């Protein structure tokens, strides 16, 4: 439910409400859980001075388990000509997911057993987010620079716990389907817990350019420094990536009833952090795809496509072990072929 109102000149007011219900059903642990969330929100955007706009918002969230929470948001934007400067503050609330609360999970991946427990004693996360953004846009190029800081209290993290003799006995009792061989390979299990706080800060740069008609280049770079603290110790947030970039080039042209689209894109990233395991190494993976639009039939458009994923055959060839984690799962270079039919 959403309404957009013009209550005064040079302003826009948005009010609304939404309802959501989540379900978790799992045979492992005989789990059958559900929870609803109801929220009402209001946002008012107004012109303060020439090129200066303020936006104020408020959201009231009622969670079936974690009660009511009020979160404000404020943005100030100065927009002279092709430039945009924004400052944003927002408070956040996130209830633990049903998996984080109730998981009772056992699986075997690459021959390694994995166990994850939810925790019904979790508290919801509350956060304070601040960002500064500058943009330049023209018909040829767009450039955006954003710096952000997110402080999170009671951050939900997955703690890895070493398996001793007492823990192994407990785990075998909880998961009788686990074989003796699988139990012998089990070194850790995971439990969702609240850390004291989390700290995520970074910088993001976006650039896109229309080099000439039909040809576009874009690039994105993100630097992220993410940590979590329990007690006096700060640790790098599990699965965080310090440096990540995406690059894409796209060309499109039509000759009569034939259209060609060529897309080259790549993702490059530094290592993925796993504080209790071996970090997953960084990688660069490139894909080349072409799409061909054919308008030769009276009853349909045909769009055959052909491309290559992982163009340079990047593969993580490390020998597997119980401490090893992965970020690149590609088996290697792959030929991708498709056909789309659009009826007229």
Predicted region positions:
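Face-selective signature of the C-terminal outer-membrane beta-barrel domain
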Residues: 1-66, 72, 79, 144-147, ...
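Residues on the lipid-exposed face of transmembrane beta-strands in outer-membrane beta-barrel proteins
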Residues: 1-5, 40-46, 74-78, 132-136, ...
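Outer-membrane beta-barrel strand-turn architecture
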Residues: 5-9, 46-50, 62, 70, ...
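Gram-negative outer-membrane beta-barrel transporters
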Residues: 9, 14, 47-54, 148-151, ...
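Transmembrane beta-barrel strands of outer-membrane/channel proteins
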Residues: 15-21, 56-60, 74-76, 87-91, ...
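Outer-membrane beta-barrel signature, preferentially recognizing the C-terminal barrel domain
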Residues: 79, 84, 91-152, 162-163, ...
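Conserved C-terminal beta-signal and adjacent last beta-strands/turns
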Residues: 87, 216, 222, 237-344
